[in-house]
Amino acid sequence: MRVLVVCPVHDPRDARIAEREIPALLAAGHDVTQAGPFTAVGAIAQPGVRPIDIPRSVGRKRARALRHTRRMLREQAPHHDIVLLHSPDAVIAASGLDHAGIVWDVHEDTAAAVGTKPWLPRALAAPAAWSIRAGEAWAERNVHLLLAEHSYADRFARSHPVVPNSVFVPDAVPRPERGRVVYLGSVTRARGARELIEVGRLLADGPAIRVDVIGGAGPEVLGDVEVARDRGWIAWHGYVKNSVALSLVDGATAGLSLLHDEPNYRHSMPTKLLEYLAHGVPFVSTPLPLAVELAEVSGGGIIVPFGDLGAAYDAIVELNADDDRRQKMADIGREWVRANANWAIDGAAFIRQLEEWARG
């Protein structure tokens, strides 16, 4: 099977694309071409993958990337059995393409997220969301859909296969030690940048628990993040490859997820929570519905109210002080992920589904 993976929006090193799906395809013996903004983000393709460099679609500057992606698809799609799209921009670029193997991997709710984008004027948020929903309806009629969340099914009229954003579970992990908590993911206002900084300040002034922040910072919070780093409130690592980032998670006291109550977060499982548990680290999270559910069914997390810095601080300090509780939460959470959110299982289902569509 020859697969063309296309995304002009995300970093080509995106964890679902580059560390789950592409390795699964290569391991199954399939040929992979990846079209993405390699030059724009300073990335290189992984071994075994043929790269195609395209401009990045970002903010209001999308027309050039759309034109290049559309032209690339017309040239490359006929030579591939599956064209795997990873963003609405890629779906737009593929419109009108006569190819039976086009697949849209839906792994975010762009219409719900558009209101949080700092580059979009508030007055345009509702029309933009409507346009995206209309695009989803068009895609459902014209291409195959693969959903990353069961909750995404409500956005579509028909049923579609689900391949969850599950994670790799290492064979062995270190014990969760005292003195260090981690945050893994993009650092933006909606993802709790202010809360991370303030919790870091409280912890630095109190029990001296370090806050490792692993991820690139959005322009609206970059200055604040740099100040917090310089003052020693957080240890900011910036963007690093997911596999490297996870090595920094190993052995932490707790993993943090202080996301705000935004529409696009309400129906998505924060993958970072699964990654924390898979690496033997309990989590502290705000009460988004799927985070609450995960804390309950796995036993590996503590839920704190939105914006409640005191509650987040207390949860971290309590976990830091109680070695037995911390280890128990880590152990049972890790076993839950192994049984219920394991890419070793879901990756095989992903391959089977693409092979079925490729056969027609």
Question: What are the residue ranges of the model-derived segments?
Answer:
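Conserved donor-binding/catalytic core segment of Leloir-type glycosyltransferases
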Residues: 4-6, 146, 173-201, 212
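N-terminal strand-loop element at the rim of the active site
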Residues: 5-15, 19-64, 76, 152, ...
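Nucleotide-sugar-dependent
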Residues: 16, 191, 241-248, 253-274, ...
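Membrane-proximal helix-turn-helix segments that form the acceptor-binding/catalytic region
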Residues: 23, 67-77, 92, 104, ...
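Glycosyltransferase donor-sugar binding loop
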Residues: 210-223, 238
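Nucleotide-activated donor-binding/catalytic signature segment of Leloir-type glycosyltransferases, i.e.
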Residues: 222-251
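Conserved acidic donor-binding segment of nucleotide-sugar-dependent glycosyltransferases
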Residues: 297-298, 302-310, 318-324
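A short, well-ordered alpha-helix in the C-terminal region of glycosyltransferases
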Residues: 318, 325-340
